[in-house]
């Protein structure tokens, strides 16, 4: 979920005096661990270990405003799994996961290949640590998996690099999970999605999960956004209407654009306030 180049503005308050932060930075090979990174914040929310003090501090600030954020992130991951299983069950055997984020349990290639043996997956992310972790999976014998380093704001490069591993004359599922909300309006997210889908074969799919403020107290939502203003990428919650426009030219699968916990229609009730909208559109 970090397919974007960063422009850090905020440093962990203890960065200059915290011995742990200095030790972590040395261990990370010079990587800046004093600026919160959206991939590592997400990893922290999922209970992962690939995060540093600044990421945990930022995540804690978000949790103080939106206490159900950890559950919402896990539900987003579960939504990803349901979507990949559904698409593989429909016969799609090629997946392009843009802004894939740090590897965790049940990664896209594992889910896709369990449901559809022979499925090919390309992971695309800008963050070099994410890319290094993903490539480490290949070293452990993962087959049909490729990793490219690319910025979501450069969709032409993503397609060119992914095209070395995927056959775009056949259906491809483009996965944009918890990534488009890190694009500002100036980045023209709708145009980026249009380019990513422009040359897809009929029967291809685009799946999106996107942060929204529709179910959040406005003041708390703004406070949480401020945390990301100082991280590696700002977060831009959008309304259902704005997110729906990402699917222009596509045919939305039932139940349409909805709370991720309600997709598919047989999914369980949310249990937490609305945080992410999600949906799947097909290329006619």
Regions found by a protein language model. Name each.
Residues 217-233:
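Short, glycine-/aromatic-enriched active-site segment of Class I SAM-dependent methyltransferases
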Residues 1-150, 154-156, 160-168, 197:
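Rossmann-like AdoMet
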Residues 233-257:
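Short alpha-helix
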Residues 179-182, 211-216:
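Short "lid" loop at the C-terminus of a central beta-strand within the Rossmann-like core
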């Amino acid at each position: 979920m970090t397919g974007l180049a960063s422009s850090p503005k905020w440093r962990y308050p203890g960065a200059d005096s915290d011995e742990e932060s200095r030790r972590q930075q040395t261990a990370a090979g010079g990587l800046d661990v004093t600026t919160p990174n959206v991939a590592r914040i997400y990893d922290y929310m999922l209970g992962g270990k690939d995060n540093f003090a600044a990421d945990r501090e930022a995540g804690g600030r978000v949790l103080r405003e939106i206490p159900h954020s950890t559950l919402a992130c896990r539900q987003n991951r579960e939504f990803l799994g349901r979507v990949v299983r559904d698409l593989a069950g429909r016969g799609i055997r090629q997946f392009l996961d843009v802004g894939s984020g740090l590897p965790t349990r049940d990664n896209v290639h594992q889910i896709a290949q369990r449901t559809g043996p022979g499925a090919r997956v390309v992971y695309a992310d800008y963050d070099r640590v994410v890319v290094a972790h993903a490539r480490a999976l290949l070293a452990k014998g993962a087959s049909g998996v490729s990793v490219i380093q690319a910025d979501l704001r450069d969709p032409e490069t993503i397609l060119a690099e992914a095209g070395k591993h995927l056959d775009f004359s056949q259906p491809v599922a483009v996965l944009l999970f918890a990534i488009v909300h890190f694009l500002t309006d100036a980045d023209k997210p709708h145009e980026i999605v249009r380019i990513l889908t422009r040359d897809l074969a009929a029967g291809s799919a685009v799946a999106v999960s996107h942060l929204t403020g529709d179910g959040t107290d406005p003041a708390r939502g703004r406070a949480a956004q401020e945390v990301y203003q100082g991280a590696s990428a700002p977060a831009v919650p959008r309304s259902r209407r704005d997110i729906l426009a990402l699917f222009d030219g596509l045919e939305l699968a039932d139940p349409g654009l909805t709370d991720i916990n309600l997709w598919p229609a047989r999914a369980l009730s949310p249990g937490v306030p609305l945080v992410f909208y999600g949906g799947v559109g097909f290329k006619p």
